[in-house]
Amino acid sequence: MTEQAQNPSSSEKRAVILLSGGLDSATVVAMARAEGYRCYTMSFDYGQRHRAELHAAERVARDLGVVEHKVIGLNLNGIGGSALTDSTIEVPEAPGEGIPVTYVPARNTVFLSLALGWAEVLHARDIFIGVNAVDYSGYPDCRPEFVEAFERMANLATKAGVEGQGFRIQAPLQNLSKAEIIQAGVRLGVDYGLTVSCYQADDSGHACGKCDSCRLRAEGFKAAGISDPTPYF
């Protein structure tokens, strides 16, 4: 019998954690581990501009000692509609008004749905996601209302939820600034040199230093008073 098919003991806590390979999700893995969870991480090869973040996710998962790291293949560039999945749309190098073109339609809904499925198989009741509503790019699926609504849906749409074994969607970074996230991660031993945040990093993980994600990351390290380990072009 595989570990996935076994019910955990009453004292064992399991969590599925969405791990992009970036700063925020790496911090969330460390937080869950510190809370005593056996951590199962999930990343997605969804047709994004580069694979550097997937390599980063593997490094982070290994460094933080997760139980299992799973990479799911999707083809969101078949849908397009985002600068991250459509090479004909340029990644902006300055903040704009409204929801930016780097928003990927329904991405967190899709990712959380697959994490929910794995959590049900694992008999895990907690799903962690590194969304943030303070220092963020304005994506609608990073807001607290979205997280709360998805949790309600998860408990309506699953066998476990119907049988009273409810799921919790945990977003521990929701109300933290980027500086606070970095400070928390450093306290928990996160090696941010392993992570990649840039929307258009090269294959080696070197960052452009110009996109919104790079800007938020650099400002966060500066505000935290911590040296930024990010390699740039």
Swiss-Prot record:
Its EC number is 6.3.4.20. The keyword Zinc applies. Pathway: Purine metabolism; 7-cyano-7-deazaguanine biosynthesis. Binds 1 zinc ion per subunit. Its cofactor is Zn(2+). Zn(2+) binds at residues 198, 208, 211, 214. CDD domains: QueC-like (cd01995). Keywords: ATP-binding, Ligase, Metal-binding, Nucleotide-binding, Queuosine biosynthesis, Zinc. GO terms for biological process: queuosine biosynthetic process. GO terms for molecular function: ATP binding; ligase activity, forming carbon-nitrogen bonds; zinc ion binding. It catalyses: 7-carboxy-7-deazaguanine + NH4(+) + ATP = 7-cyano-7-deazaguanine + ADP + phosphate + H2O + H(+). It holds the Pfam family QueC. ATP binds at residues 19-29. Belongs to the QueC family. Catalyzes the ATP-dependent conversion of 7-carboxy-7-deazaguanine (CDG) to 7-cyano-7-deazaguanine (preQ(0)). This is 7-cyano-7-deazaguanine synthase 1. It comes from Pseudomonas fluorescens (strain ATCC BAA-477 / NRRL B-23932 / Pf-5).
